């Protein structure tokens, strides 16, 4: 009987190889194939040295493989009977297009599961000693993509609405739109003296 494949969308955590979950590591060590994004720690890939390895790097402005091709690759590997780890930085379902891959696999009838990872939206502030919630200061936090701002598109929630919130605002992929984000927030009433931190390459050995 033909072996039925399975695809796990595994969050690698943020940066250091030892931030992956125990379950994610075990799946990586036992899989038949791994499809991995850019910025994955080579030490993690070494845990799957026995497996087929397929790079599918995606960084701003540099996509080595279109998303549609990644979806097709995952479906093809799963349908061939392999146990596949789709290794993604952070958490696959937090601005990682994991939802798109999950739906593509479901549509093709390939069994799949998401294995959560530590997202940069909490890991990077934590590494800088910044809690995203703090009693008496921030009772909530909001994660927003900053990438579409540079095209002039409206963000998932308008910046004007976000400016009125009292929680911590975490913008991912927003470095190139930093001036626009700050200007729109202050124009909408966010006090200019609001504490802020800007981190570039927060999952790198020496973030700026």
Give, region by region, the residue ranges found by the protein language model:
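Short hydrophobic/aromatic-enriched beta-strand-loop microsegments
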Residues: 52-58, 109-113, 132-142, 189-198
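Class I SAM-dependent methyltransferase SAM-binding "motif I" and its flanking Rossmann-like core
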Residues: 91-165, 208
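Class I S-adenosyl-L-methionine
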Residues: 1-17, 22-118, 123
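Non-catalytic, surface-exposed connector residues within folded enzymatic/regulatory domains
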Residues: 22, 38, 135-137, 193, ...
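A contiguous loop/helix-start segment that scaffolds small-molecule binding in enzyme catalytic cores
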Residues: 4-7, 79-84, 145-208
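Short secondary-structure boundary/capping segments
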Residues: 25, 44-45, 76, 132-134, ...
């Amino acid at each position: 009987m033909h072996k039925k494949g399975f695809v796990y969308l595994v969050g690698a955590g943020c940066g250091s190889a030892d931030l992956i979950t125990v379950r994610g590591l075990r799946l990586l060590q036992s899989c038949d194939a791994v499809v991995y994004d850019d910025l994955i720690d080579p030490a993690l890939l070494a845990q799957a040295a026995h497996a087929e390895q397929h790079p599918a790097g995606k960084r701003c402005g540099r996509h080595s493989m279109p998303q549609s091709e990644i979806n097709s690759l995952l479906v093809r590997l799963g349908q061939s009977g392999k146990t596949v780890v789709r290794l993604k930085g952070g958490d696959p379902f937090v601005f990682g297009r994991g939802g798109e891959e999950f739906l593509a696999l479901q549509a093709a009838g390939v069994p799949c599961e998401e294995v959560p990872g530590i997202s940069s939206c909490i890991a990077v502030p934590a590494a800088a000693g910044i809690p995203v919630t703090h009693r008496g200061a921030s009772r909530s936090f909001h994660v927003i993509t900053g990438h579409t701002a540079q095209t002039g598109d409206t963000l998932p929630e308008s910046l004007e609405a976000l400016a009125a919130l009292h929680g911590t605002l975490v913008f991912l992929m927003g470095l190139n739109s930093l001036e626009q984000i700050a200007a729109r927030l202050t124009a909408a009433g966010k006090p200019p003296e609001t504490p802020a931190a800007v981190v570039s390459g927060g999952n790198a050995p020496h973030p700026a």
